[in-house]
Regions:
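Conserved catalytic or metal-liganding residues and their short signature motifs at active sites
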Residues: 1-2, 91
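Conserved catalytic neighborhood of penicillin-recognizing serine enzymes
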Residues: 2-45, 130-145, 152
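Penicillin-recognizing serine hydrolase domain
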Residues: 43-208
Length: 208
């Protein structure tokens, strides 16, 4: 399944001889935005949904079929998924409203909460290999003070091209939780600067 990862993808640098737990693969998606981790998990899920799938492509497709069925059950109205990693493939699309709903549901998961709020980690794979991962969300890293937001506790970056960046952020301000997002930022860092503006707006006008 690793050979299905699109060109110029962000990676967790997983190799075919590595062995990782499901939790480590989730961390590999959340910190370095590893598209390779997403495909490994998708293929594993597809093997459960379709045990007789003859190829990795068929396994991933079985996962995507289940993914789209689940999307409908949770009320996504403007989304259709043709890849497990958010890559810019034909007919793979969503809306900010749908992504916000996904983010709200995802943040109920303990593993997602744990790793989406982790600036970096040194990971020892199940196979014993060691990897250093850094979170692509600079708003949670105090060592990037220009973008750091103390109230932020997640969630996920994304990009479609070198001039189309996305972000879903989660913050807690005086006991209240908020999720917000940006699609179509022209510069990678704009999403972090706009997040600081959004959080300041929340603190000024919403949380009093």
């Amino acid at each position: 399944e690793l050979n299905l990862v699109g060109p110029n993808s962000s990676l967790a640098y997983i190799k075919s001889h590595h062995q990782l737990t499901v939790e480590q693969l989730m961390e590999g998606m959340l910190l370095p935005s590893g598209n390779d981790a997403a495909y490994v998990l998708a293929a594993a899920g597809g093997r459960i949904l379709n045990p007789g799938a003859p190829t990795a492509r068929d396994e991933v497709d079985a996962f995507l079929m289940g993914m789209n069925e689940y999307a409908r059950t949770i009320g996504l109205c403007g989304s259709h998924f043709t890849c497990p990693d958010g890559y810019d493939y034909p007919e793979n699309y969503s809306t900010l409203e749908d992504m916000a709903l996904i983010a709200r549901l995802a943040y109920e998961d303990e593993i997602i909460r744990k790793y989406s709020n982790l600036p970096s980690d040194r990971v020892t794979y199940y196979s014993g290999h060691i990897m250093e991962w850094k979170n692509t969300n600079w708003c949670i890293d105090p060592y990037t003070p220009e973008y750091y937001i103390p109230e932020m506790n997640g969630l996920k970056t994304g990009s479609v091209s070198k001039d189309y960046y996305c972000f879903l952020g989660s913050v807690e301000i005086e006991g209240q939780s908020f999720i917000f997002g940006f699609f179509g930022e022209e510069k990678m860092t704009d999403r972090f600067l706009d997040s600081k503006t959004a959080v300041q707006w929340l603190k000024t006008y919403i949380v009093k």
